């Protein structure tokens, strides 16, 4: 959601803040602003709309400052107007705050502050914070005056938040605090940074320290001090990220999304190299997979429950199919936002898997935390077993759950998930292989077939990209004015139909729905006519003939049919008006391939419509509020 950056050091703060905000644009925003300190004065510059509007304002000013904070806002409280943009200031314009999150008790705090004479200039929940801190500052600056004022203020805040604070009376300090919202500190040479996410500081340093819940820190030109909310000094050591600045550049692609679609074969290849044992054979006495998960996590499982949101939920649906059909473990998949308020009965020997690409999705974290709390203290069979699947092991998820499958997809900038979705699918394939081996639920020769098929996927993915993109780009010209799409799939490819529909609606703003192909006659068929294209995933296997039959029902209603299917299937060629060919593979492995043409179709339709593919309206890459 919102993005925070902060800097203190010898360089010009304004440009570093603006460059950091540019790296956080992918999180989604509707306004932006920075605040800097120079010669005892606080300067705040804000702008509605795109970050370039702020850049143009800043360029008109001669800002000489070595400490500052910046923010991209995604509106939650108050309209997306300049007066609601961050940073927010106290009544004397001496103190500025940026915040990511939601202050749940802000109305109560605002009423109290107004009764004491404070004047508010925005509709936001954030503005209560600078007023609270200002009240708690000593009249004369003291050694720990700002730090202590922030510490006391956060005790009055309810909700999830990350904040950064600067004050004209404390020109050599930048204070940050975290509670249920991400914040990371970067360590440079005589300079220090803070940000909501690491891409903002990767150009300057790879030494980072993610703050944990209930922690605050003081950044000065000489170092970083970390404290808990009770004021106790903590010993913390930064870690080194295995990233570099090139990973967050477009590298010649028009959009990050297209670049990330093309990175998918490499993501799958890296995942296989990291987790699939090259020396495994059918007769080997060891598992084909090395996930480094303790036996206690997976032994005697009777049930698996998956919690996730959005695209990660679709990955969970594919995971459910694999875990039930191959590993033979009953599995449920729930939206994390629903799980929290209607949790299922506690069942013994249950593994709970949280799936989130960012590791910061608020609903998923809250669902996992609730599951942890309601099982703690119960007898052995009901003890919590938690596993996370994420692209960011250093995230809040990595601190919450004891075990992680790192999808190793690298930073994803485009708001619409592509390579991280495929990486999540790979995590479920690998987990399924591990459980199948342990439980002996699958014949070894069948396991060998799946392992061989997985190893062939990267080359097959590259084949699709090389052979299909130009055709799909040309095909997209037929649909740039289309108002509705239907996506159909069955079995393990039903979630891919859902994902294809989600991608299209996210970035092209075209209404699209995904359905199980067998459900067409139970309602969706009423929507069909010559103006509603139907995209159908038809892969040879257990439901191939059924899917083609369902597609014929759509043809009878004059719908234009687009088929994701192998090229050499004669019956499919006669059924569909347009083919998006994919190699014929084992039906269980097909989702990795069938999703690629759907990603490309969504991308090219959106690009043809002249839309901002990487930053679609109203969406955020990392949804850090409930």
From Swiss-Prot:
Q: Which Gene3D superfamilies match?
A: Glucose-6-phosphate isomerase like protein, domain 1 (3.40.50.10490), Glutamine Phosphoribosylpyrophosphate, subunit 1, domain 1 (3.60.20.10)
Q: Does the keyword Repeat apply?
A: yes
Q: Where is the SIS domain?
A: 293-441, 471-616
Q: Which reaction does it catalyse?
A: D-fructose 6-phosphate + L-glutamine = D-glucosamine 6-phosphate + L-glutamate
| Entries under InterPro entries matching the protein | GATase_2_dom, GFAT, GFAT_N, GlmS/AgaS_SIS, GlmS/FrlB_SIS, Ntn_hydrolases_N, SIS_dom, SIS_dom_sf
The EC designation for this entry is 2.6.1.16
| Cellular component GO terms, alphabetical | cytosol
One Pfam short name: SIS
SUPFAM superfamilies per record: N-terminal nucleophile aminohydrolases (Ntn hydrolases), SIS domain
Task: Tell whether Ribosomal protein is among the UniProt keywords.
Answer: no
Keywords on record: Aminotransferase, Cytoplasm, Glutamine amidotransferase, Repeat, Transferase
Q: Which residues cross the membrane?
A: none
Record-level GO BP terms = carbohydrate metabolic process; fructose 6-phosphate metabolic process; protein N-linked glycosylation; UDP-N-acetylglucosamine metabolic process
Cell compartment(s), UniProt:
Cytoplasm
Record-linked NCBIfam families? glmS (TIGR01135), PRK00331.1 (NF001484)
Assembly and binders: Homodimer.
What the protein does comes down to: Catalyzes the first step in hexosamine metabolism, converting fructose-6P into glucosamine-6P using glutamine as a nitrogen source.
User: What name does this protein carry?
Assistant: Glutamine--fructose-6-phosphate aminotransferase [isomerizing]
Q: Which organism is it from?
A: Thermosynechococcus vestitus (strain NIES-2133 / IAM M-273 / BP-1)
């Amino acid at each position: 959601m919102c993005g925070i950056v902060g800097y203190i050091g010898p360089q010009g703060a304004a440009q570093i803040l603006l460059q950091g905000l540019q790296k956080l644009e992918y999180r989604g925003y509707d306004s932006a602003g920075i605040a800097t300190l120079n010669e005892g004065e606080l300067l705040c510059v804000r702008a509605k709309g795109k970050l370039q509007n702020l850049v143009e304002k800043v360029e008109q000013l001669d800002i000489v400052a070595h400490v500052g904070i910046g923010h991209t806002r995604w509106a939650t409280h108050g309209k997306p107007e300049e007066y609601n943009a961050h940073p927010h200031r106290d009544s004397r314009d001496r103190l500025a705050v940026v915040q990511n999150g939601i202050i749940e008790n802000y109305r109560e705090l605002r009423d109290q502050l107004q009764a004491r004479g404070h004047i508010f200039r925005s509709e936001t929940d954030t503005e209560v914070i600078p007023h609270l801190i200002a009240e708690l500052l000593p009249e004369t600056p003291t050694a720990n005056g700002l730090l202590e004022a922030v510490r006391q203020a956060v005790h009055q805040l309810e909700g999830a938040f990350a904040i950064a604070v600067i004050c004209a009376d404390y020109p050599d300090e930048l204070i940050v605090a975290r509670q249920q919202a991400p914040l990371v500190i970067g360590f440079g040479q005589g300079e220090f940074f803070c940000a909501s996410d690491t891409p903002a500081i990767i150009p300057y340093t790879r030494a980072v320290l993610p703050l944990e819940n209930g922690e605050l820190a003081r950044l000065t030109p000489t170092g970083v001090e970390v404290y808990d909310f009770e004021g106790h000094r903590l010993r913390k050591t930064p870690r080194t990220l295995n990233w570099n600045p090139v990973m967050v550049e477009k590298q010649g692609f028009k959009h990050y999304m297209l670049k990330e679609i093309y990175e998918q074969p490499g993501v799958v290849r890296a995942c296989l190299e990291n987790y699939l044992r090259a020396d495994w054979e059918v007769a080997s006495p060891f598992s084909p997979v090395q996930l480094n998960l303790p036996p206690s996590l997976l032994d005697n499982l009777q049930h698996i429950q998956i919690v996730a949101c959005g695209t990660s939920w679709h990955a969970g649906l594919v995971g459910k199919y694999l875990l039930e059909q191959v590993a033979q473990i009953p599995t449920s998949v729930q939206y994390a936002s629903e799980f929290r308020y209607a949790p299922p009965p506690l069942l013994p020997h249950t593994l709970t898997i949280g799936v989130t690409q960012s590791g910061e999705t608020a609903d998923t974290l809250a669902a996992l935390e609730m599951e942890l709390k309601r099982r703690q203290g119960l007898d052995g069979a009901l003890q919590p077993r938690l596993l996370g699947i994420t692209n960011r092991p250093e995230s809040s998820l990595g601190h919450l759950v004891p075990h992680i499958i790192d999808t190793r997809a690298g930073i994803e900038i485009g708001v619409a998930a592509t390579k991280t979705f495929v990486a999540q699918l790979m995590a479920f394939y690998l987990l399924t292989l591990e459980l199948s081996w342990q439980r002996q639920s699958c014949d070894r020769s069948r396991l060998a077939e799946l392992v061989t098929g997985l190893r062939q996927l990267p080359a097959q993915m590259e084949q699709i990209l090389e052979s299909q993109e130009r055709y799909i780009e040309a095909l997209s010209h037929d649909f740039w004015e289309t108002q509705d799409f239907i996506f159909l799939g069955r079995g393990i490819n039903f979630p891919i139909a859902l994902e294809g529909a989600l991608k299209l609606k996210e970035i092209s703003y075209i209404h699209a729905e995904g359905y199980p192909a067998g459900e067409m006659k139970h309602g969706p068929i009423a929507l069909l006519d010559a103006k509603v294209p139907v995209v159908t995933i038809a892969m040879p296997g257990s439901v191939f003939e059924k899917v083609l039959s369902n597609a014929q029902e759509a043809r009878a209603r004059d719908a234009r049919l687009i088929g994701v299917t192998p090229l050499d299937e004669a019956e499919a060629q006669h059924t569909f008006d347009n083919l998006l060919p994919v190699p014929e593979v084992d039906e269980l492995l097909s989702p990795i391939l069938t999703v690629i043409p759907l990603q490309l179709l969504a991308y090219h339709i959106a690009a043809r419509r002249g839309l901002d593919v990487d930053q679609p309206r109203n969406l955020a890459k990392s949804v850090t509020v409930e």
